[in-house]
């Protein structure tokens, strides 16, 4: 993952809060009361605007590239779809 430095440094307050500057929130389309997901990658903390509908129901992968199927009731990543296809094929083989 490529990360671009903003040059912005913020201190954590006594309650563990960090303020995201308004310029950065505007640039990233983060409004007041928006939910953010928190990820950890090695020693990095990654904040991402929460998109509840794009989480793969098999792998847990969150991506805008995930597939929405069955009228939006099922969300799958490429890997999740491959796992489901493989399991269905195995089940169908066992029925024969």
Curated annotation (Swiss-Prot):
UniProt keyword terms in alphabetical order: Activator, DNA-binding, Repressor, Sporulation, Transcription, Transcription regulation
Q: What does this protein do?
A: Ambiactive repressor and activator of the transcription of genes expressed during the transition state between vegetative growth and the onset of stationary phase and sporulation. It controls the expression of genes spovG and tycA. AbrB binds to the tycA promoter region at two A- and T-rich sites, it may be the sole repressor of tycA transcription.
**This chain belongs to which protein, by name?**
Transition state regulatory protein AbrB
Give GO BP annotations, semicolon-separated.
negative regulation of DNA-templated transcription; regulation of sporulation; sporulation resulting in formation of a cellular spore
SMART domains attached here? SpoVT_AbrB (SM00966)
Q: What is the lineage of its organism?
A: Bacteria, Bacillati, Bacillota, Bacilli, Bacillales
SpoVT-AbrB domain segment(s): 7-52
Q: Which family does it belong to?
A: To B.subtilis Abh and SpoVT.
């Amino acid at each position: 993952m490529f990360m671009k430095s903003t040059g912005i440094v913020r201190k954590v307050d006594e309650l563990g809060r960090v303020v995201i500057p308004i310029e950065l929130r505007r640039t990233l389309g983060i409004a007041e009361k928006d939910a953010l997901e928190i990820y950890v990658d090695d020693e990095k903390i990654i904040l991402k605007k929460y998109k509840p509908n794009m989480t793969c129901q098999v792998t847990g992968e969150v991506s805008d590239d995930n597939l929405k199927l069955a009228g939006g009731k099922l969300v799958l990543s490429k890997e999740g779809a491959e796992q489901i296809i493989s399991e269905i094929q195995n089940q169908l083989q066992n029925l024969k």
